[in-house]
Amino acid sequence: ISVAAAEGIWRRFLATYPSVDARAIASADPAALRAIGLSNRKVEYVTGIARAFAAGDVKPAQWSSLADDALRDHLTSLRGVGPWTADMVLIFHERRPDVLPLGDVGLVNAAARLYGWDAPDLRARRETLRVHAERWRPWRSVATWYIWLELDAEPVVY
């Protein structure tokens, strides 16, 4: 999904659910969620995750005490949360400084272009980035931000 499409869906989501209350989202009419731009599968994921938050199964107040890998494992145990989403939570919500979101195709391709890597496919580019980014520790999130800035002509305010 493009940044522009995601921003549009997020704007419509906030217009419909301004408080972003887990209980309200858990019991939301699926048609209303589809109307803001979510697919049937995403509606299942969003309402399921909201139910987990509402039930207290997800405890964001405890996230800061977890190591990156432990938090990533916790998040990806939720249906619909994959490695990319977990990495975005680590970077943007938890502000972890050393996250390298190798599942971000835009990041991988932009790094290959910026560094002039002649890797034949995405898998090879991803591995080249993983190895190269070791030198960025413990600031891989920061390096990721700079590559994303290069990717987007217009800065995105997060």
Go through each PLM region and give its residues.
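Alpha-helical ds-nucleic-acid-binding substructure associated with the helix-hairpin-helix region
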Residues: 1-79
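C-terminal accessory module of base-excision DNA glycosylases/AP lyases that mediates lesion recognition
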Residues: 44, 64, 68, 83-158
